[in-house]
Amino acid sequence: MNSPGLNDSKRLLRAEVVRLIIDGQTELALKLLSDYYGISEPDLKVGTVKRHRRVLACYVQNEKRIYLSKGEYITNPFVILHEYYHHLRSSELGKKRQVEKRADLFASNFISEFVTQQQSNRGGNR
């Protein structure tokens, strides 16, 4: 199932990143993602962090590092991408992009509803 609104190059990027992670080339996948989003790559380390010992993985913002509780998670796309999202959100550029995108969507939804109501009112006056 294709995600609506995605162009072919973004679909290809997503598929390639998942393939790289499954193939054990997680560092390359993180580099590809970071290049795409224009942010630094996070470090990747197998180990645990105090207060987060029971989770599969966690992202530590001040270290810019993804910790995996077990080495086998390095080939798990869901775990890696979930933690990468935290890295993306914590980067200034990532935060700004997400906030701006959400703000644009918020405004667009209001304007779209206004336009729909205006068109409906004009249709009823005929």
Where are these regions (language model features)?
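Short pre-active-site segment immediately N-terminal to the catalytic Zn-binding motif
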Residues: 64-80, 93-98
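Auxiliary, metal-adjacent structural segments of Zn-dependent hydrolase domains
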Residues: 7-67, 71-73, 119-126
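Active-site His/Glu-centered metal-binding helix of metallohydrolases
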Residues: 80-89, 102
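N-terminal low-structure segments adjacent to metalloprotease catalytic domains
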Residues: 1-14, 88, 99, 108, ...
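Short histidine-centered catalytic/ligand-binding loop motif
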Residues: 18, 91-92
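Post-HExxH zinc-binding segment in Zn-dependent metallohydrolases
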Residues: 97-126
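Hydrophobic (often cysteine-bearing) scaffold residues that line and stabilize catalytic clefts
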Residues: 25, 77, 99, 103
